Amino acid sequence: MGKFKTVNELVNSLQPDYPVYCIRLNEIKKSVRFFKNNFPGKILYAVKTNPNEKIIKQIIANGVNEFDVASLNEIKLLNKIKSDAKLHFMHTIKSKESISSAYFDYGVKSFSLDSKDELRKILEATNQAKDLELFVRIAISNEHAEIDLSRKFGALPSEALGLVRLCKEHSKKLGISFHVGSQCMHKISYSKG
């Protein structure tokens, strides 16, 4: 497919009767640079937001080499594009088979969880691995999000400390994570997290 200066030009020229991707690679480049210049922490691209190979390659080309993956298919996609990218399996509900394959077949060491049951699955599926990086996802208020996920994922704050202590016994690195909800438009939500 060709390049077009605007979406209108594409529509007028092709008159498609099927969905069309309009990828603005320069905008991706600018966005990655903005993040890198303004965010002091590690930047992970959440593959589920858009698993298009061209987009992922552009993100990699601009210096992002760590990815939030939510499924084995996303892990396989990243392995195909950049086998040495660092992957973080951040979905809190995973099958033992997915955990095992992620760990043994693709070298994923970083996993998110929000329950003792998920910790047990991770430990069993990795044969009690000693090099795990575990992230306890804590449920926070999603009051400013279009889609509130606070009741779906995350350990309750009252249970989180015990889970963090338990994970400390089984992890090389330990962290916490939270999700402010989908389409969150208020930066205060990040401060509350």
What do the PLM-derived regions correspond to, one by one?
Residues 1-132, 165-172, 188:
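A charged N-terminal "starter" segment
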Residues 93-95, 116-119, 139-143, 181-183:
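Short acidic/polar capping segments at secondary-structure boundaries
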Residues 125, 140-193:
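Active-site loop/helix belt of alpha/beta enzymes
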Residues 133-139:
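ATP-grasp fold ATP-binding core
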